[in-house]
C-alpha cells in the first residue's frame, strides 16, 4: 500500500468516520423496522394459537399480514434513501475539496480553486446507474424484503412455529437487506467521490500543476485480485487505469458490477511540480501549521460561501463613462509593447493568437511573433482592475455556442461588449452567423479582464476583453445562455 502524507491520512480517517456514521444510521433504520415487524409478529403468533388451520389460510388474513409488513417498510424506506444520498453527496464534496486541501496544505500554496456547484453534486447523486436511479433500486430491495418477511411469517404460522423461530428468520432477512443497503451506500458514495476527485485532478492540471493520480487499494482478504494488481499504479490525469480488458478513470467508474460494487479503493494525487506562475504569489509565505480538513474547509470554503453574491448590472451612460475612464488610466500606465499588443489583438491578430491558445493549426513561422503578443497582452490585462460586477454580451456562431455550453474554461482570450447591440450586429454581419446567438456574460469585479473601449482599434465595439484560461459555469435563463465567470 502506498505511503500517505499526513493530509491524505486525515482525509482517509474522515472517510472512515463518514462511513461509520452512515452504517450507524442505516442500522438504526433497519433496527426500528425489525422492532415494528416483531411487534406485529407477536400479535400474529399469539392469535394463531387460537385459530384453526383453515382460518389461518384465509386470504383476507394473508393479505393483512402482507399489507402491514409493506406499511412498516414503506414508512422507513425514505429514511434509507435519504441516508444514502446524504452520504453520497458528502463524499462527492469531500472527493473534490479533499484534493484541493491536500494540494494547498502539502505544497504550502493558495490556489485559485473554483467552488463546486451544489446542483452539480445533486445531479451526480441522482444520476442513474445501469439505467436505474437509486430510488428504484432501493424500492426493489425493499419490496424483496417485504415479500421475504411476509413469506417467513405466513410459512411459520402454517407450520405452527414459535415466535422465537419466526423472529430468527426475520432477523436474517432484515440483516441481509441492511447489508445490501450498506453495500449500495458504499458503492454510490464511492462513485460520486471518484467523479468529483477526477474533476479536481483535471482542474488542477489546467491551473499549471504537474499532477498524476495513483490507485490506492485497501489490501486485505476482501480486496479484489484485480484491484490488488492496480494498487500503486500511476497514470496521467487524463488517462485511464486498465485491468484485464476493463478501463476507468478511477475506482467504481468501470461500469462493470464485478469491478465497482462495494469497492473500497481510492486514488491519491502525485505532484511532480507547480508552475512558477502559481508559486509567484506564495514565495514569501512561511510553512503553515497543520490544519485539519474541517479547519481548512471553514477557512477556504465557508468563507467564500458567506461572501455577498455579485450584483450584476448593465452599465448605464454614467457607468460606461466611469469604465472608460478606468480604461484610459490603465492604458496610460502600460508599456509601449503592451499597448501595441492590445492594438494588434483588436485589429487582425486575434484569430491567429486564439488558434495557438486552442492548440489548433498555425503557421510555425508566425509563432514567435504571436507568442510575444500573447505574453504582452497577458501582462497588460493583469494591470486592469475591474471595480464592479458587470454584464457583457457576445455574438457567437452555432458551433461556438455549443462549445461554450459544453465547456468550463476559455483557453483563449474572449472578446465581449458592454453594448448588447454590438453583439446582435455581429450576427447580422455575415451569413455564416445566421444560426448564431447572443450569449450573456456575468463578470464579477476583480475578474482578469480589461475594458478596452475607445482604446481599441475598433473603437465602437465597447469591448471588454476576458483573459485566457478563465473558468466559467453556464445556465440557460429565459432561453438565453448566461455565462458566469469564476476566475
Swiss-Prot record:
Primary enzyme class: transferase
TR mART core domain mapped to chain residues: 315-487
Record flagged with keyword Secreted: yes
Source superkingdom: Bacteria
Catalytic-site annotation from UniProt: 394, 415, 463
Coiled coil: 2-51
Binding site for NAD(+): 346-358, 394-400, 463
A GO term for molecular function: toxin activity
Keyword Transferase on entry: yes
Reactions catalysed, as given in the entry: L-arginyl-[protein] + NAD(+) = N(omega)-(ADP-D-ribosyl)-L-arginyl-[protein] + nicotinamide + H(+)
Keywords: Coiled coil, Glycosyltransferase, NAD, NADP, Nucleotide-binding, Nucleotidyltransferase, Secreted, Toxin, Transferase, Virulence
Subcellular location per the Swiss-Prot or TrEMBL entry: Secreted
Record-linked Pfam families: ADPrib_exo_Tox, Phage_Mu_F
GO cellular component annotations of the record: extracellular region
Gene3D superfamilies, alphabetized: Toxin ADP-ribosyltransferase, Chain A, domain 1
InterPro entries assigned: ADP-ribosyltransferase (IPR003540), Phage_head_morphogenesis_dom (IPR006528)
EC number: 2.4.2.31
Role this protein plays: A probable mono(ADP-ribosyl)transferase, it may ADP-ribosylate Arg in target protein(s). Upon expression in yeast cells causes cell death.
Protein name (database record): NAD(+)--arginine ADP-ribosyltransferase EFV
Amino acid at each position: 500500500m502506498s505511503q500517505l502524507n499526513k493530509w491524505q491520512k486525515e482525509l482517509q480517517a474522515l472517510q472512515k468516520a463518514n462511513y461509520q456514521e452512515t452504517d450507524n444510521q442505516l442500522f438504526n433504520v433497519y433496527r426500528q423496522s425489525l422492532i415494528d415487524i416483531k411487534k406485529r409478529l407477536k400479535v400474529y403468533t399469539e392469535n394463531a394459537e387460537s385459530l384453526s388451520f383453515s382460518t389461518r389460510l384465509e386470504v383476507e388474513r394473508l393479505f393483512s399480514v402482507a399489507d402491514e409488513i409493506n406499511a412498516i417498510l414503506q414508512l422507513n424506506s425514505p429514511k434509507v434513501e435519504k441516508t444514502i444520498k446524504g452520504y453520497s453527496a458528502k463524499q462527492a464534496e469531500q472527493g473534490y475539496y479533499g484534493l484541493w486541501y491536500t494540494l494547498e496544505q502539502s505544497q504550502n500554496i493558495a490556489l485559485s480553486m473554483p467552488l463546486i456547484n451544489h446542483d452539480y453534486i445533486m445531479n451526480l447523486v441522482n444520476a442513474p446507474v445501469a439505467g436505474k436511479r437509486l430510488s428504484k433500486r432501493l424500492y426493489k430491495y425493499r419490496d424483496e424484503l417485504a415479500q421475504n418477511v411476509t413469506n417467513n411469517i405466513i410459512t411459520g404460522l402454517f407450520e405452527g412455529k414459535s415466535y422465537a423461530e419466526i423472529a430468527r428468520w426475520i432477523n436474517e432477512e432484515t440483516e441481509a437487506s441492511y447489508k445490501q443497503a450498506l453495500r449500495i451506500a458504499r458503492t454510490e458514495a464511492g462513485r460520486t467521490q471518484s467523479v468529483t476527485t477526477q474533476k479536481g485532478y483535471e482542474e488542477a492540471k489546467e491551473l499549471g500543476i504537474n499532477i498524476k493520480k495513483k490507485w490506492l487499494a485497501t489490501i486485505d482478504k476482501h480486496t479484489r485480485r484485480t484491484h490488488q494488481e492496480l494498487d500503486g499504479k500511476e497514470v496521467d490525469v487524463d488517462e485511464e487505469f486498465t485491468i484485464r480488458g476493463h478501463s476507468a478513470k478511477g475506482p467504481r467508474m468501470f461500469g462493470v458490477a464485478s469491478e465497482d460494487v462495494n469497492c473500497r479503493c481510492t486514488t491519491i494525487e502525485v505532484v511532480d511540480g507547480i508552475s512558477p506562475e502559481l508559486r509567484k504569489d506564495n514565495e514569501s509565505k512561511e510553512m503553515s501549521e497543520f490544519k485539519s480538513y474541517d479547519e481548512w474547509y471553514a477557512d477556504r470554503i465557508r468563507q467564500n460561501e458567506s461572501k455577498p453574491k455579485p450584483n450584476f448590472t448593465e452599465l448605464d451612460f454614467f457607468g460606461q463613462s466611469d469604465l472608460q475612464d478606468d480604461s484610459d488610466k490603465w492604458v496610460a500606465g502600460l508599456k509601449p509593447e503592451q499597448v501595441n499588443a492590445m492594438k494588434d489583438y483588436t485589429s487582425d491578430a486575434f484569430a491567429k493568437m486564439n488558434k495557438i491558445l486552442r492548440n489548433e493549426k498555425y503557421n510555425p513561422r508566425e509563432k514567435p511573433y504571436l507568442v510575444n503578443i500573447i505574453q504582452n497582452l497577458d501582462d497588460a490585462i493583469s494591470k486592469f482592475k475591474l471595480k464592479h460586477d458587470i454584464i457583457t454580451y457576445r455574438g457567437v456562431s452555432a458551433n461556438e455556442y455549443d462549445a461554450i455550453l459544453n465547456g468550463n474554461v476559455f483557453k483563449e482570450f474572449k472578446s465581449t461588449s458592454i453594448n448588447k447591440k454590438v453583439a446582435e450586429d455581429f450576427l447580422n454581419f455575415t451569413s455564416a452567423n445566421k444560426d448564431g446567438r447572443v450569449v450573456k456574460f456575468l463578470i464579477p469585479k476583480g475578474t482578469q479582464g480589461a475594458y478596452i473601449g475607445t482604446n481599441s482599434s475598433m473603437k465602437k465595439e465597447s469591448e471588454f476583453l476576458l483573459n485566457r484560461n478563465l473558468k466559467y459555469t453556464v445556465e440557460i435563463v429565459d432561453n438565453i445562455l448566461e455565462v458566469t465567470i469564476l476566475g
